[in-house]
Amino acid sequence: MANETVLYDYWRSSASYRVRIALNLCGEAYRSVPVDLLAKAHRAPEHLARNPQGLVPVLDIDGERLTQSLAIIEYLAETRDGTGLLPAHPIDRQRVRALSYAVAMDIHPVCNLGVVARVMAGAGDGEAARREWMQKFIGEGLAAFERMLDHPATGAFCHGDRPTMADLCLVPQVYNARRWDVDLAACPLLVAIDRRCAGIDAFQRAHPDRAKP
C-alpha cells in the first residue's frame, strides 16, 4: 500500500530502537523490514537506494521517506498531536534536545559498528579491546548524562513526568550499557528512569528482544 508506514531497521540498532519507541508512543501502526547490519545488508544497493548513508533506520511514512532517528522523532512530534516527545516551551525543548544529543551525538557515534570494528582490527585481542572501548565511552557518557539529570526539570522521566525524546535516546543506551557490563552504580537517576520506561507498553514492544527477527 502506498501509504503504509514501513520501518527499515535492525533489531539491536540504538537509532532504530528510538524510532520504534516513538512510533509506538504515537500509536502509529507500522511494518518492520529487517536490515541485517552484521550481514552488511545496509551496504547493499537496495538499501543504499533508500538511504545513501547506508544507515538505519529508514522510515516510509505519509508518502515520504525519512532518515536520521532524531529527525524522524522530531517529525513525529510535529505531525502527531499529543505525543509530548518535544515540550511546547522553547527552553524545555532545548533541554530535551540537549539530553538527546548527549546520547545520539556524543556517545553513539564512537560506539557504532564501524568505529568499533576499526578498533578491533587494530588490537591484538579484538574482543577485549571492544569491551574496554564500550565500557569507557558508554560509561563516561552516561556519567555525564547523570549529571545533566541533576536539574529541577527532571521528574519521573528525563524532563518532567512523561517520556520525551530524551527518554527515547536514554533507554537504548542503557540497554547497550548493560550488554557491555558498564557499571551504572553511580547513575541512580537514569537507572530509575529506565526502570519506569520499562513499565510502559510502548517501550516494551520496541525492546530488541521483541524486535529480533
Swiss-Prot record:
Q: Give the record's pathway.
A: Amino-acid degradation; L-phenylalanine degradation; acetoacetate and fumarate from L-phenylalanine: step 5/6
Q: Name one Pfam family in it.
A: GST_N
Residue ranges annotated for the GST N-terminal domain, each copy included: 3-84
- One GO CC annotation, please? cytoplasm
UniProt-listed Enzyme Commission number(s): 5.2.1.2
SUPFAM superfamilies in the cross-refs: GST C-terminal domain-like (SSF47616), Thioredoxin-like (SSF52833)
According to UniProt, the reaction catalysed is: 4-maleylacetoacetate = 4-fumarylacetoacetate
User: What's in the keyword line of the UniProt record?
Assistant: Isomerase, Phenylalanine catabolism, Tyrosine catabolism
Provide the GO biological process annotations: glutathione metabolic process; L-phenylalanine catabolic process; tyrosine catabolic process
- What InterPro entries does the annotation carry? Glutathione-S-Trfase_C-like, Glutathione-S-Trfase_C_sf, Glutathione_S-Trfase, Glutathione_S-Trfase_N, GST_Zeta, GST_Zeta_C, GST_Zeta_N, Thioredoxin-like_sf
What Gene3D superfamilies has UniProt attached to this entry?
1.20.1050.10, Glutaredoxin
GO function term, MF aspect, one:
glutathione transferase activity
Q: Which family does it belong to?
A: Belongs to the GST superfamily. Zeta family.
Protein name (record):
Maleylacetoacetate isomerase
Quote the gene name from the UniProt entry: maiA
